[in-house]
Amino acid sequence: MPMVSAQVDDTERYTVRDYVRELAATGGSTMLIGGQILDLEGEHKQLSEPEVRAVYEGKTAALLTTALRFGAMSANATEAQLEAVTDFGYNLGLAFQVIDDILDLTASTEKLGKTAGKDVNAQKSTCPALIGMDGARSEAKCRTQAALDALMIFPEERRTRLVELANYLLNREY
């Protein structure tokens, strides 16, 4: 099996060690693993908005942010650009999860391609359950706009695809 260093080249700003550090931080107890634990422990309990946000942050937002940071690092992003991509990923990840929870309540199993209503059946606290459908839609729009605002550091031609992605995710039906 090849070593990580054989698959990833250093850039002017980032080394293989930086990528490994990013990956380790994302997978750790405060991010993906921690988010999954919070999610499982939250079943059959009434979580507060900050607790639900912590689940979203630790799972969807962390995963999306890390993927985007890897792309930015491989493109030799400056510190300011990396921060902008981080903000974009964080907010887009939260918006994605809110929309996912809305779709779990409103879309069919056939449309989703997965079992609809799983959150209700597991008695999970979700954004729509806590603040209603209109509040959840508003939250998703606000988070998407915050994600788009974070990209303003980049020239228009460099952000077009990410803007399209953000708008697609906000308006998706599955």
Where are these regions (language model features)?
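All-alpha prenyltransferase/terpene-synthase fold signal
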Residues: 1-174
